[in-house]
Amino acid sequence: MDFHYTSEKNIQIVLALLKANGIRKVIASPGATNESIVASMQYDPYFEMYSCVDERSAAYMACGMAAESGERIVLSCTGATSSRNYMPGLTEAYYRHLPILTITSSMDTNKVGHLYPQCTDRSTPPADTVVASYCIETIKDDDDEWDCTIKVNNAISDLRYNGGGPVHLNLITKGCNDYSVKQLPKVRIVKRIGYGDTFPPL
């Protein structure tokens, strides 16, 4: 079987927007729920991948890489309580204004609270761990695709907006094993424009 990108459209959009914004360094902690995004990143030589089995250590690695390189760094972990291990490092990143995009893969949010194993509520992270948090749902139609594109653009923008800091994406995944997609979709970069900024030419 040829191995390319996952067929999950929301993950494709995340990857395409990371590339379009020049974000390439990824620290991945192994797991089942984040398999689709990590495997797709490993297929693409654009991404500079680092592996760290312990999420607490991975978060501090991201702090160091962001501080030293000045680049935006991606963290990826599986579902369940593994994402909680990011919190000490993200707290440091929050107070140091380090641009770390934390992608926690997850089952559908409607399974939270119904005794599904390894399924936790990530809708309200502690106030001093991230500057913003977004849930990236599975894409079923054009409206879902638009919503996904806007949220991921917002998340990337938030990494450096008003001083910046860590941002959380809760990425819903079905755990698809179809890696037949050879090309990422074309995506639209949405730039934030504030007072005093120059609008792009029409």
Feature-to-residue mapping (PLM):
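N-terminal alpha/beta PP-like core and its mobile active-site loop of ThDP/TPP-dependent enzymes
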Residues: 1-202
